[in-house]
UniProtKB/Swiss-Prot annotation:
It comes from the Bacteria. GO terms for molecular function: DNA binding. Keywords: DNA-binding, Transcription, Transcription regulation. Gene3D superfamilies: Tetracycline Repressor, domain 2. Residues 6-66 form the HTH tetR-type domain. Residues 29-48 bind DNA. InterPro entries: DNA-bd_HTH_TetR-type_CS (IPR023772), Homeodomain-like_sf (IPR009057), HTH-type_Tx_Regulator (IPR050624), HTH_TetR (IPR001647). PROSITE patterns: HTH_TETR_1 (PS01081), HTH_TETR_2 (PS50977). The keyword Acyltransferase does not apply. This is HTH-type transcriptional regulator SAB2452. Coiled coil: none annotated.
Length: 185
């Protein structure tokens, strides 16, 4: 990519991030972003195929910081229960803090992009390692099911419609995904 194209893309991401923070993701259209930047819609869509795609790239900086701190949890805590509990607390707080961006990403047309992203792979590897057993297929399945339980839409539904507290949500996940021996470590 040419230097000016890279700079344009960064400018788009910065202005979008600013507008999303100030007015909310749902209140900002791609047209509004283009007007704010003084660029044509073609230029905007050359860099980002839709709003979901733009949201995905806007959140990348936060994801990189998140992953660095997330990995530190395994060094700071020793039992599987502690690691899982603290990591879930951290992940759920991240979801709350970035709810509208994450909703926009998940609502997009390219759902596979998230599952193929470095962020998803980092989460997968983290929990796969925690659940590791002799049955690799089961461990992968269990890890994927946990991550599906942590999708923004499932989490929001449980909190907003089932009226489950965040702490209860975390505790239910601990009960489902860690067996009794691990919970009592």
């Amino acid at each position: 990519m040419r230097k000016d194209a890279i700079e344009n893309r960064q400018r788009i991401e910065e202005i979008a991030h600013k507008l999303f923070d100030e007015e909310g993701v749902e209140n900002i259209s791609m047209n509004r972003i283009a007007k704010e930047l003084g660029i044509g819609m073609g230029t905007l869509y050359r860099h980002f195929k839709d709003k979901s795609d733009l949201c995905f790239y806007v959140i990348q900086r936060d994801l990189n910081t998140f992953i660095t701190q997330f990995k530190q949890i395994k060094d700071d805590y020793h039992s599987d229960y502690e690691v899982m509990k603290v990591s879930l607390d951290y992940l759920l707080q991240f979801k709350i803090d970035n709810k509208t961006l994450l909703h926009c990403i998940e609502a997009g047309n390219n759902k596979l992009r998230f599952y193929q992203s470095a962020f998803y792979q980092e989460l997968f590897d983290f929990y796969y390692d925690l659940f590791k057993s002799d049955d690799d297929i089961f461990t992968k399945f269990k890890t994927d099911m946990l991550l599906q339980s942590l999708s923004t839409s499932v989490f929001a539904f449980q909190i907003e419609h089932r009226h489950i507290s965040i702490e209860a949500y975390r505790n239910y996940l601990l009960n489902i995904y860690l067996d009794e021996v691990e919970r009592n470590d």
